[in-house]
Swiss-Prot record:
Main location: virion
Protein name in UniProt: Capsid protein
Family: Belongs to the alphamovirus/ilarvirus capsid protein family.
Source organism: Alfalfa mosaic virus (strain Strasbourg)
Location of this chain's protein in the cell: Virion
InterPro entries: Coat_Ilarvirus
Pfam families: Ilar_coat (PF01787)
Length: 218
């Protein structure tokens, strides 16, 4: 056995500094796994939260398309979970803020009428509780919002009270470019604002209930 073989054999299993540097360089060049998209703690491109309010991001981006060119009608729901004892539901104010990106800039309008045929607000709860004070607002800065007040239950005390609220909104198309494909909407962010309330549990994740495409579905 030559002296070079003995020398190499004597260092078997012990990495050299050169091999360590090479391994580190090779590891750095390996493709990294995709980063997880975690919702941020406060709105980024929406309006800023007001004092005394809690903002929460609900869900991931959602894309909707119109198949008949009449518009898109869709329904969102979220669960309000109160876990603390002796919590009053009255005077809770919710605001849903949608940040949207249309497929064709300037080709959509927000309907002024978001009520049913008999004049009731389309925001309702379970079991089908009405929100007569619901107000719909369009804002060019971030999209549109629906503001409503939860119904007052005359001093009712909720213990482990769980309530699911659904909000139905309607978008109509306006001045769609000739020859364009079916327009679509991408909802970048959905935020819910509620008044800070003692011992109130967090709002659960956003649930997509359904997509309505017929004009008389709502």
């Amino acid at each position: 056995m030559s002296s070079s073989q003995k020398k190499a054999g004597g260092k078997a299993g012990k990495p050299t500094k050169r091999s360590q540097n090479y391994a580190a360089l090779r590891k750095a060049q390996l493709p990294k796994p995709p980063a997880l998209k975690v919702p941020v703690a406060k709105p980024t491109n929406t309006i800023l939260p007001q004092t005394g309010c809690v903002w929460q991001s609900l869900g991931t981006p959602l894309s909707l398309s119109s198949f008949n060119g009449l518009g898109v009608r869709f329904l969102y729901s979220f669960l309000k979970d109160f876990t603390g004892p002796r919590i009053l539901e009255e005077d809770l104010i919710y605001r849903m803020v949608f940040s949207i990106t249309p497929s064709h800039a300037g080709t959509f309008c927000l309907t002024d009428d978001v009520t049913t045929e008999d004049g009731r607000a389309v925001a309702h709860g379970n079991p089908m509780q009405e929100f007569p004070h619901g107000a719909f607002h369009a804002n060019e800065k971030f999209g549109f919002e629906l503001v409503f007040t939860a119904p007052t239950h005359a001093g009712m005390q909720n213990q482990n009270f769980k309530h699911s609220y659904a909000v139905a909104l309607c978008l109509d198309f306006d001045a769609q470019p000739e020859g364009s494909k079916n327009p679509s909407y991408r909802f970048n962010e959905v935020w819910v604002e509620r008044k800070a309330f003692p011992r109130a549990g967090p709002l659960r994740s956003l649930i997509t209930v359904g997509l309505l495409d017929e004009a008389d579905d709502l």
